[in-house]
């Protein structure tokens, strides 16, 4: 059961984007599991992908196609990751692009393939290929919610975000979806996300915007510390709402676009954590007082990855010794522990490296019992800060992953 508000918002139509989906029976019966995006000619498309050395076949093909061509289509299947499938997997990903391209009248290099699901099994390629025509016949501009359902695996809820905004008197839209609930620790987490706007943005800035916003969103979440083979995030600017193209970071409209995209990306990333496998609590880990951002990030992830801390949060057990343990093993050079402060929300549990004199277990337990809480750490050695989002670790996480081949 997802934590907090995960309501699917009204998903505004993005001019220049059409979406279709179908039941291809890649793995799941009686549900949409194949999704196609179509972008108007002239759209600018950017992508970032998993840093796993075991990158899946569709990731390899997508990166190659992005470097070669102007992208017109995306095709996404769920239920099978097409990862650790060797050259056959690459050929199958290419076959998918070729079949869609033939039906749509574009080059195969103008198609990006994406897969999510079980690793190590070959795609049921004939079923997938047979599903492409029905998905193309289903193309429409108001199918973002259907697409969000269509890319789910162990997710319990579809994930979406959408905003409309005005720049120089022109109303624009930005809409996106994501999926993921386990195998989530990005550098880039199994995480897929697709965001589009009808604002006019140059190709170079589309890539800059994506890299900038992913760093503080999808690269700042973790559920279980495992990095997927298939992580992919795509940002598209169709330019179909009109206006002069934004081609410089000095353009005053750029900062507004950046702000909105960051908000959309943050929401999509945090929805993944809220829907973490077996999650009952949403945890913000905020670390400040570092000499640099990297050491703050390292400490935050050390806390967020700790199964001892995550199980303590699940049990509402304010065992703060586990938090200082995680700080200590984060590898901060020459950390003066006598300057370290730790809070659970506004309750200080550690002062100057030891137990806060006025802290009581009852105070800590009350915070830990909340559905949402913040673990805040001050390293006392500088002004840098960073934040990571995670969830607790429950019995259900074990059950879900014992029952699901992932």
From Swiss-Prot:
Q: Where is this site: Cleavage?
A: 189-190
| Record: residues binding substrate | 153, 179, 190, 277, 401, 406
Q: Where in the cell is it found?
A: Cytoplasm
The pathway to which it is assigned is: Amino-acid biosynthesis; L-arginine biosynthesis; L-ornithine and N-acetyl-L-glutamate from L-glutamate and N(2)-acetyl-L-ornithine (cyclic): step 1/1; Amino-acid biosynthesis; L-arginine biosynthesis; N(2)-acetyl-L-ornithine from L-glutamate: step 1/4
Question: Which reaction is the catalytic activity of this chain?
Answer: N(2)-acetyl-L-ornithine + L-glutamate = N-acetyl-L-glutamate + L-ornithine; L-glutamate + acetyl-CoA = N-acetyl-L-glutamate + CoA + H(+)
Q: What is its EC number?
A: 2.3.1.35, 2.3.1.1
Keyword Cytoplasm among record annotations: yes
Answer yes or no on keyword Nucleotide-binding: no
Q: Which Pfam family is one of those matched by this entry?
A: ArgJ
| Keywords tagged on the record | Acyltransferase, Amino-acid biosynthesis, Arginine biosynthesis, Autocatalytic cleavage, Cytoplasm, Multifunctional enzyme, Transferase
Query: Active-site residues?
Result: 190
Q: Name one GO biological process term.
A: L-arginine biosynthetic process
**Annotated GO MF terms:** glutamate N-acetyltransferase activity; L-glutamate N-acetyltransferase activity
Position of the signal peptide: none
- Site, Involved in the stabilization of negative charge on the oxyanion by the formation of the oxyanion hole: residue positions: 116-117
InterPro entries of this UniProt entry?
Answer: Arg_biosynth_ArgJ, ArgJ-like_dom_sf, ArgJ_beta_C
Q: Name one GO cellular component term.
A: cytoplasm
Name the family the entry cites.
Belongs to the ArgJ family.
Q: Which HAMAP family match?
A: ArgJ (MF_01106)
Q: What does this protein do?
A: Catalyzes two activities which are involved in the cyclic version of arginine biosynthesis: the synthesis of N-acetylglutamate from glutamate and acetyl-CoA as the acetyl donor, and of ornithine by transacetylation between N(2)-acetylornithine and glutamate.
- What does the annotation say about its assembly with partners? Heterotetramer of two alpha and two beta chains.
Q: Which NCBIfam families match?
A: ArgJ, PRK05388.1
Name it. Arginine biosynthesis bifunctional protein ArgJ
Species of provenance = Acinetobacter baylyi (strain ATCC 33305 / BD413 / ADP1)
Q: What is the lineage of its organism?
A: Bacteria, Pseudomonadati, Pseudomonadota, Gammaproteobacteria, Moraxellales
Q: Which gene encodes it?
A: argJ
């Amino acid at each position: 059961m997802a934590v907090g508000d995960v309501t699917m918002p009204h998903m505004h139509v993005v001019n220049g984007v059409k979406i279709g989906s179908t039941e291809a029976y890649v793995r799941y019966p009686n549900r949409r599991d194949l999704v196609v995006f179509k972008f108007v000619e002239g759209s600018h498309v950017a992508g970032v992908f998993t840093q796993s050395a075991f990158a899946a076949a569709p990731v390899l093909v997508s990166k190659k196609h992005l470097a070669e061509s102007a992208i017109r289509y995306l095709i996404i299947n769920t239920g099978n990751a097409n990862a650790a499938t060797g050259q056959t997997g690459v050929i199958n990903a290419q076959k998918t692009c070729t079949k869609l391209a033939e039906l749509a009248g574009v080059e195969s290099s103008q198609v990006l393939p994406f897969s999510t699901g079980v690793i190590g099994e070959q795609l049921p390629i004939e079923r997938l290929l047979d599903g492409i025509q029905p998905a193309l016949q289903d193309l429409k501009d108001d199918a973002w919610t259907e697409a969000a359902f269509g890319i789910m695996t162990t997710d319990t809820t579809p994930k979406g975000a959408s905003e409309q905004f005005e720049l120089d008197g022109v109303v624009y839209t930005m809409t996106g979806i994501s999926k993921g609930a386990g195998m989530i620790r990005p550098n880039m987490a199994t995480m897929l996300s697709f965001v589009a706007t009808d604002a006019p943005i140059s190709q170079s800035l589309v890539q800059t915007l994506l890299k900038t916003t992913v760093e503080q969103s999808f690269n700042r979440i973790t559920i279980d510390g495992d990095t997927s083979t298939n992580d992919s995030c795509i940002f598209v600017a169709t330019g179909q709402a009109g206006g002069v193209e934004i081609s410089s970071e000095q353009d005053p409209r750029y900062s507004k676009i950046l702000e909105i995209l960051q908000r959309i990306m943050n929401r999509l990333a945090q929805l993944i954590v809220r829907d973490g496998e077996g999650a009952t609590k949403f945890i913000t880990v905020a670390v400040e007082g570092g000499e640099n951002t990297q050491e703050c990030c390292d400490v935050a992830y050390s806390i967020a990855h700790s199964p001892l801390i995550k199980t303590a949060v699940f049990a509402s057990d304010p065992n703060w010794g586990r938090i200082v343990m995680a700080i200590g093993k984060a590898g901060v050079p020459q950390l003066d522990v006598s300057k370290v402060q730790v809070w659970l929300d506004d309750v200080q549990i550690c002062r100057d490296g030891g137990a806060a004199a006025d802290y009581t277990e009852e105070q800590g337990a009350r915070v830990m019992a909340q559905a949402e809480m913040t673990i805040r750490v001050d390293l006392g050695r500088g002004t840098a800060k960073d934040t990571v989002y995670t969830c607790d670790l429950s019995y259900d996480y074990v059950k879900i992953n014992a029952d699901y081949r992932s």
